[in-house]
Amino acid sequence: MSKNAGVVRELMRAFPDDVVAAQDDAEARAAAAELLIEVSVPEFVTAMVAPDGWSSERNGVEGFFSSWGEFVAGFARFAIELEELIERGDVVVVLARQHGVPKGGSAEITTDGAAIFYFRDSLVERLEFHLDRAQALRVIDLEA
């Protein structure tokens, strides 16, 4: 496993079991911020990418947290399950299954998504979270 893949695995291990519940956990947030600062360039980009091409980009640790906060705002519970890591030079792709229960609902919604981590000098410079796995794989020239 490359150093970059090791960084991604470490970040994924640090991801909370329930992203919604972790929004108000100051200790978990501080630990995640410390790890992000350690493994990323100072103004790394977090991009949330929808299937229709819409995206939102924010910079730095606070941008990461605000992006995720907005994304999970409509959920009572939200979790990410790591399925596979794909390495491609300075890019690492995480294939993941997302599980969420909308606020006011009881049925779980499950989708297959992906995250693309772009590295420079073994530091994360860009993170893209894709709701559409096939679209993410096309971005890096892989077939779904």
Name each region found by the language model.
Residues 20-21, 49, 53, 102:
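Residue-level detector of alpha-helix boundaries and kinks
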Residues 30-90:
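A solvent-exposed, acidic/Ser-Thr-rich amphipathic alpha-helical stretch
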Residues 13, 42, 62, 115-117, ...:
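Short non-domain terminal segments
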Residues 24-25, 60, 132:
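Intrinsic-disorder/low-complexity, polar/charged segments
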Residues 1-34, 38-42, 138-144:
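Short, low-complexity N-terminal intrinsically disordered segments enriched in polar/charged residues
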Residues 1-3, 7, 69-144:
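A beta-strand edge to alpha-helix "cap/lid" segment located at domain peripheries
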